[in-house]
């Protein structure tokens, strides 16, 4: 019987198999969008279990768990045992068939943890134990995994207010992978968010040393942070914009909008 998600998964023809195994699989990875925190790389973190490796800070996995009715305490609660959190994730997986996460999770189980069984509530303990054995190996650290995966460049997602201290620490640690920040400016673009005022005044404004009250101030603050990021090697702006709306207005109208949200003085 063919093994579940074997080395030829999605490679349905001989040509596809040859192109991948003889060429693509050997090429270095340039990852332009990663959710790995640079601190984990700088400290060469060793993950104790799959809950730490998968569920500590992965919003895509969290969204699926929420959609399956898992409580927020179980998903993000710091007091929830890792094994319990992983069980909830495993019980959700059979319902995720057709979602890219189903393929991603099982490909990782196969490639990094040598586990080839479909993840479910019934197989959770078996997968947990097998992954634990794999994670205990000397090279299964944050930098070790990047090295074995041939990741040449990795770009993290970073808010414009980030001081990028951990990117500097990665360089000092001598990591073989080049780790660069990306300018993730979502918080600056979501003016409808109730926290936008505080973000602009106390987060972005303070980070850029700009007293924000007009649209020109917003631009100046973002430009300063862009310059700071660029000095640390950033070359990518990564924004989640569902649709682009355009309406031509005068500069004073933009100032009114910003003023209304920042200090209640706009009209």
Set out the residue ranges of the language-model regions.
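Metal-cofactor-binding active-site regions of metalloenzymes
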Residues: 1-267
């Amino acid at each position: 019987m063919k093994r579940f998600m074997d080395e030829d998964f999605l490679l349905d023809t001989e040509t596809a198999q040859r192109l991948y195994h003889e060429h693509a699989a050997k090429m270095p990875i340039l990852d332009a969008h990663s959710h790995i925190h640079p601190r984990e790389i700088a400290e060469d973190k060793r993950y104790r279990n799959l809950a730490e490796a998968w569920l500590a800070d992965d919003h895509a996995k969290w969204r699926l768990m929420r959609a399956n009715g898992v409580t927020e305490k179980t998903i993000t609660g710091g007091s929830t045992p890792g094994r319990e959190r992983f069980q909830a994730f495993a019980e959700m997986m059979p319902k995720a068939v057709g979602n890219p996460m189903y393929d991603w999770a099982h490909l990782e189980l196969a490639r990094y943890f040598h586990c080839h069984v479909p993840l479910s509530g019934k197989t959770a303990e078996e997968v947990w134990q097998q992954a634990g054995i794999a994670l205990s190996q000397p090279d299964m650290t944050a930098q070790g995994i990047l090295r074995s995966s041939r990741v040449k460049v990795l770009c993290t997602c970073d808010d414009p207010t980030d001081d990028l201290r951990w990117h500097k620490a990665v360089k000092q640690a001598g990591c073989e992978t080049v780790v660069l920040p990306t300018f993730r400016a979502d918080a600056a673009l979501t003016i409808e968010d109730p926290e936008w005022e505080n973000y602009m005044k106390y987060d972005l404004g303070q980070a850029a040393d700009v007293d924000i009250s007009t649209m020109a101030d917003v631009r100046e603050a973002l430009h300063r942070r862009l310059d700071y990021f660029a000095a640390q090697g950033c070359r990518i702006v990564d924004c989640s914009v569902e649709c682009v709306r355009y309406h031509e207005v005068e500069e004073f109208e933009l100032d009114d909008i910003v003023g209304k949200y920042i200090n209640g003085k706009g009209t």
